[in-house]
């Protein structure tokens, strides 16, 4: 299964990456004086199918208005055979970095430096 091209929002349902960026921008505009953390991370769940160990990957994008809640979006990633813990951690990291490299420049451009936020790539090691 290829990495999904859309995200899921618990409140808005299926969203394109462009819609996620627009929603993040709108959320930050609601309280421009607040401080925000944009956290992008991936995780996986292993299972065995016919004796073959496989992992299903999920990537989340979280916008945390520090002290006041937040929003999140997620998407299913790839399924692949897992040979080692190292390989699984590398894949999780790769998915997070790919998501950040596609979304963050667009978010920065759409905000035009108008908001106080920081980026965090969450890597779950182990």
Feature annotation, model-predicted:
Residues 1-46:
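Basic, amphipathic N-terminal segments that precede the first structured/catalytic domain
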Residues 15, 19, 56, 91-94:
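Conserved active-site and cofactor/substrate-binding residues in soluble primary-metabolism enzymes
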Residues 32-34, 110-117:
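Short helix-terminating capping/connector loops at secondary-structure junctions
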Residues 39-41, 120-126:
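Short glycine-rich or small-residue beta-strand-to-loop segments that form or flank ligand, phosphate
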Residues 40-41, 47-74:
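Acidic, metal-ligating active-site segments
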Residues 45-48, 94, 126:
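Short acidic, S/G/P-rich loop/turn micro-motifs used as interaction or catalytic elements
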Residues 46-51, 81-85:
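Short secondary-structure capping micro-motifs at structural edges
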Residues 79-114:
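Acidic helix/loop or adjacent segment enriched in Glu/Asp that either coordinates divalent metal
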């Amino acid at each position: 299964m290829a990495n999904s091209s859309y995200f899921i929002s618990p409140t808005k349902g299926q969203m394109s990456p462009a819609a996620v960026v627009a929603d993040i921008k709108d959320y930050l505009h609601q309280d421009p004086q607040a401080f925000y953390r944009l956290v992008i991370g991936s995780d996986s769940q292993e299972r065995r199918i016919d004796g073959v160990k496989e992992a299903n990957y999920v990537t989340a994008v979280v916008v945390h208005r520090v002290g006041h809640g937040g929003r999140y979006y997620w998407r299913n990633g790839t399924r692949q055979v897992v040979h080692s813990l190292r390989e699984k951690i590398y894949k999780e990291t790769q998915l997070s970095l790919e998501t950040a490299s596609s979304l963050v420049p667009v978010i920065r451009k759409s905000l035009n430096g108008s908001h106080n936020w920081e980026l965090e790539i969450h890597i779950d090691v182990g």
